From Swiss-Prot:
Subunit description: Homodimer.
Domain of life: Bacteria
The UniProt record lists the keyword Cytoplasm: yes
Name of the molecule in the record: 23S rRNA (guanosine-2'-O-)-methyltransferase RlmB
Gene Ontology biological process terms, A to Z: rRNA processing
Biological source species: Escherichia coli (strain K12)
Functional description taken from the UniProt entry: Specifically methylates the ribose of guanosine 2251 in 23S rRNA.
Pfam families reported for this sequence: SpoU_methylase, SpoU_sub_bind
Amino acid sequence: MSEMIYGIHAVQALLERAPERFQEVFILKGREDKRLLPLIHALESQGVVIQLANRQYLDEKSDGAVHQGIIARVKPGRQYQENDLPDLIASLDQPFLLILDGVTDPHNLGACLRSADAAGVHAVIVPKDRSAQLNATAKKVACGAAESVPLIRVTNLARTMRMLQEENIWIVGTAGEADHTLYQSKMTGRLALVMGAEGEGMRRLTREHCDELISIPMAGSVSSLNVSVATGICLFEAVRQRS
């Protein structure tokens, strides 16, 4: 069994973390620029089989996405399960979690994972029924974060949130109509941040299970932000407070 990843950053990140997972790599014939050559040499030094391919082949393998001239066939990484969450929390003194409710675009999922990794988030939790898949597109956008941040899919998000609360984790959800802002919220300690889908926001039951609702203050004429942008803003306010 294998999966495909593509893009310079995604391949580079996996090579640094788990070179043993590579099975073969396809490089665009004739592309030997200064960004790709060091990566090719690093792959060869690990004994990875490299094959040259034409653009049509790479486009087909990546479903027409931007692959930057490199695609890798790799062994699947660790798949985190719902029952891994209690042990993960037990191992942490100050858990810092991100919950994504209804983020169905793989680009947004990948961008949120990238921000989560940069912010030091310990795990990202998503519902099984309303979430984008961690496919090659999401992994490319994540720029390696998909290999470092556990992504945990849960059957019942409200039940998982209750479990987190039983573990003394404070759950902060984002909502445009919240009566106080991100910058008025205390985001230290044992924390889970909940981000809803663009437009729709969090589902009713998810909202009801939050301990606190906050908004991002908006100064311009737009009424909302892309979910990955909003996630980055909230995560790094938490980082500021926690540092």
